[in-house]
Amino acid sequence: MENSFKAALKAGRPQIGLWLGLSSSYSAELLAGAGFDWLLIDGEHAPNNVQTVLTQLQAIAPYPNQPVVRPSWNDPVQIKQLLDVGTQTLLVPMVQNADEAREAVRATRYPPAGIRGVGSALARASRWNRIPDYLQKANDQMCVLVQIETREAMKNLPQILDVEGVDGVFIGPADLSADMGYAGNPQHPEVQAAIEQAIVQIRESGKAPGILIANEQLAKRYLELGALFVAVGVDTTLLARAAEALAARFGAQATAVKPGVY
């Protein structure tokens, strides 16, 4: 049950990932063989629930890449269910301050360190109580990544970084750019300056910085600055653009698409 993704971040080894939004175990397994270090199963903006997350975790399990799951909100009940089906690494969205970061950590820990309910006899995570001492080992293998996506969260970053149990901080460029007044333009110089400053600050604190960016040049720039988990594409975008390109080669006209962060 060792969390190799958490170990890689702790060792300072950059991890390259892909975002999964198709909500399909079939496509998740297909992409698990592509060679990425981690795959993000999105429960915030993709039509996922606990059952579809479970089937994708099962599909990815035979492969070396590590799944990361994003719940729809920083909700301890939802987090408990996601952990019980086997999630070890969580990306918690829209964390605004240290208190909210602390709540996210507590939701992943069994008492007395946290508030995670004990139901290991029913849980895939414990292999239905077949993992010896699961209740004693589970806390140490949980990896908590919190998402900062607003100016308020950026202002509170030093306090968020001080929260014990937060393994990494993920910068959400789409929401951050919107909050800064540049919706749809995460490459605006002011947004980029804020992102770069945050990456350096997070890395210097000893935590792992992360981001999603489909722009190859920017992805490499963030890695140079010290980002440790970088998602470089989204399955829905890859499929849509590849299909449009194929159709265009035979004269078809696709609906115009404005390039974005994804």
From Swiss-Prot:
Substrate binds at residues 147, 174-175. Keywords: Aromatic hydrocarbons catabolism, Lyase, Metal-binding. Pathway: Aromatic compound metabolism; 4-hydroxyphenylacetate degradation; pyruvate and succinate semialdehyde from 4-hydroxyphenylacetate: step 7/7. The keyword Protease does not apply. A divalent metal cation binds at residues 149, 175. GO terms for molecular function: 4-hydroxy-2-ketopimelate aldolase activity; metal ion binding. One of its GO terms (cellular component) is cytoplasm. InterPro entries: Aldolase/citrate-lyase_domain, HKHD_aldolase_ent, HpaI, HpcH-HpaI_aldolase, Pyrv/PenolPyrv_kinase-like_dom, Pyrv_kinase-like_dom_sf. Binds 1 divalent metal cation per subunit. Its cofactor is a divalent metal cation. The record marks 84 as: Increases basicity of active site His. It catalyses: 4-hydroxy-2-oxoheptanedioate = succinate semialdehyde + pyruvate. It comes from the Bacteria. The active site is at 45 (proton acceptor). It is an enzyme of class 4 (lyase). GO terms for biological process: 4-hydroxyphenylacetate catabolic process; phenylacetate catabolic process. Its EC number is 4.1.2.52. The record marks 70 as: Transition state stabilizer. Belongs to the HpcH/HpaI aldolase family. Homohexamer; trimer of dimers. This is 4-hydroxy-2-oxo-heptane-1,7-dioate aldolase. The gene is hpcH.
